């Protein structure tokens, strides 16, 4: 299930983004400040390039690129 980012409380969204950008394997080998990485993801959400996917079975949220979401989920 896709969750519109604007429906989340600001603090919840920030924590979700911070969790995503600090996961192992998400850095690009550079020492980019956390604030910059959070801002990039927030902007991608606002542009619709990234989406929040909630999986009810596992009760997990994840950020995904829109291009990786099945087209039928976007209708």
From Swiss-Prot:
Cited SUPFAM superfamilies: YehU-like (SSF118001)
Sequence similarity: Belongs to the UPF0270 family.
Species annotation: Azotobacter vinelandii (strain DJ / ATCC BAA-1303)
Species lineage: Bacteria, Pseudomonadati, Pseudomonadota, Gammaproteobacteria, Pseudomonadales
Top-level taxon in the UniProt lineage: Bacteria
Family annotation (HAMAP family): UPF0270
Pfam families: UPF0270 (PF06794)
Name of the protein described by the UniProt record: UPF0270 protein Avin_35000
């Amino acid at each position: 299930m896709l969750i519109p980012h604007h429906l989340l409380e600001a603090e919840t969204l920030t924590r979700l983004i911070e969790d995503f950008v600090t996961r192992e394997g998400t850095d690009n080998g550079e020492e980019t400040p956390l604030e910059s990485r959070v801002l990039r993801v927030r902007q991608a959400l606002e542009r619709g390039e990234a989406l929040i996917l909630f999986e009810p079975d596992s009760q997990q949220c994840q950020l995904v690129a829109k291009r990786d979401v099945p087209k039928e989920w976007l209708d």
